[in-house]
Amino acid sequence: MTNIRKSHPLMKIVNHSLIDLPAPSNISAWWNFGSLLGLCLGIQIITGLFLAMHYTSDTLTAFSSVTHICRDVNYGWIIRYLHANGASMFFICLFLHVGRGIYYGSYTYSETWNIGILLLFAVMATAFMGYVLPWGQMSFWGATVITNLLSAIPYIGTDLVQWIWGGFSVDKATLTRFFAFHFILPFIIAALVMVHLLFLHETGSNNPTGIISDADKIPFHPYYTVKDALGFLLLIALLLTLVLFSPDLLGDPDNYTPANPLNTPPHIKPEWYFLFAYAILRSIPNKLGGVLALVLSIAILAVMPLLHTSKQRSMMFRPISQCLFWVLVADLLTLTWIGGQPVEHPFIIIGQLASFLYFSLILILMPTCSLIENKLLKW
């Protein structure tokens, strides 16, 4: 008799995706972040669901409802901080996952890569709207500043902003719709994840060498299920350490002050994971130019498959490209630091140079470097 795992219509799909899936034998810990992102999404959906049971999306009671969750709801404080710090973990895993894709040339699977970019945009949108919900000072002013950027769009900009706000300023209508979108988007993300995996399983996983590994595959279970389980354990340990010992480490103290439209905070800045994009936005004095640069800072990932000029897929055996990759990482860390600094000398010029370097590396330096490496190999 055939095993139910291989014959049952539903079990068969799970079996082909998680159990009998042929996987390369040499994928390293950098390949753990896909499953860790799945875990993060699960944690966010579950904690978010419990928070939504107690939260009220009204400007008069939103801040109080979050306080009520932390003080009066059973274990509400841990649910709230798991959700807030879970977002930070989500982005840490996302950045490492994308970084691994760039380093090992996984972007050559263009369908999987493009769905991944869509996922990145969706997660960023969800996180932004979630940050508005507690209705603290940074929530309100962050929402005002970022939504206002759309007014830079020629002709329809102002109407578009007022349509999104549901009025002439960020108010009750804005908060209600942001809550609705923040609730539905994670489920859209989960659906996109399925498409992402569907495309990935069409081609099979890449591996550190970038060489086709069809000749040397091993079953996903037990080898990579055990490896993923260890990753889960480490991620949960890190998240719980953050939540139980220093829950406000990555937050902004201004968000513990209720939103006040009459009082602007001295430094309006987003959560740490958006600071690099915020620094790129601020580095261009023109409003429309800044908005375009902001969108392009993520959208530029879509041109990476087109700019792959190397004869080798992975950077594993390309030392010059490796150097440029780590310069890119250092540049993004610099942009993250600049995004949190006030707009004054010398931070303005550092931000402009770092932004210029970011686009130059991806569009010019890395493809040129790949061509030089091809020449060095006499190909």
From Swiss-Prot:
InterPro entries for the chain: Cyt_b/b6_C, Cyt_b/b6_C_sf, Cyt_b/b6_N, Cytb/b6-like_sf, Cytochrome_b, Cytochrome_b_C_euk/bac, Cytochrome_b_N_euk/bac, Di-haem_cyt_TM
Bilayer-crossing regions: 33-53, 77-98, 113-133, 178-198, 226-246, 288-308, 320-340, 347-367
Protein localization: Mitochondrion inner membrane
Sites where the protein binds heme b b566: 97, 196
Bilayer topology term: Multi-pass membrane protein
Binding site residues for a ubiquinone: 201
Binding of heme b b562, residues: 83, 182
GO biological process, one term: mitochondrial electron transport, ubiquinol to cytochrome c
A GO molecular-function descriptor: ubiquinol-cytochrome-c reductase activity
Domain of life of the native organism: Eukaryota
Keywords, alphabetical: Electron transport, Heme, Iron, Membrane, Metal-binding, Mitochondrion, Mitochondrion inner membrane, Respiratory chain, Transmembrane, Transmembrane helix, Transport, Ubiquinone
Cofactor comment text: Binds 2 heme b groups non-covalently.
GO cellular component: mitochondrial inner membrane; respiratory chain complex III
Cofactor list: heme b
Similarity remark: Belongs to the cytochrome b family.
Assembly with partners or alone: The cytochrome bc1 complex contains 11 subunits: 3 respiratory subunits (MT-CYB, CYC1 and UQCRFS1), 2 core proteins (UQCRC1 and UQCRC2) and 6 low-molecular weight proteins (UQCRH/QCR6, UQCRB/QCR7, UQCRQ/QCR8, UQCR10/QCR9, UQCR11/QCR10 and a cleavage product of UQCRFS1). This cytochrome bc1 complex then forms a dimer.
Function field: Component of the ubiquinol-cytochrome c reductase complex (complex III or cytochrome b-c1 complex) that is part of the mitochondrial respiratory chain. The b-c1 complex mediates electron transfer from ubiquinol to cytochrome c. Contributes to the generation of a proton gradient across the mitochondrial membrane that is then used for ATP synthesis.
Misc note: Heme 1 (or BL or b562) is low-potential and absorbs at about 562 nm, and heme 2 (or BH or b566) is high-potential and absorbs at about 566 nm.
Protein name from the UniProt record: Cytochrome b
Organism name: Ochotona curzoniae
Lineage: Eukaryota, Metazoa, Chordata, Craniata, Vertebrata
Encoding gene (name): MT-CYB
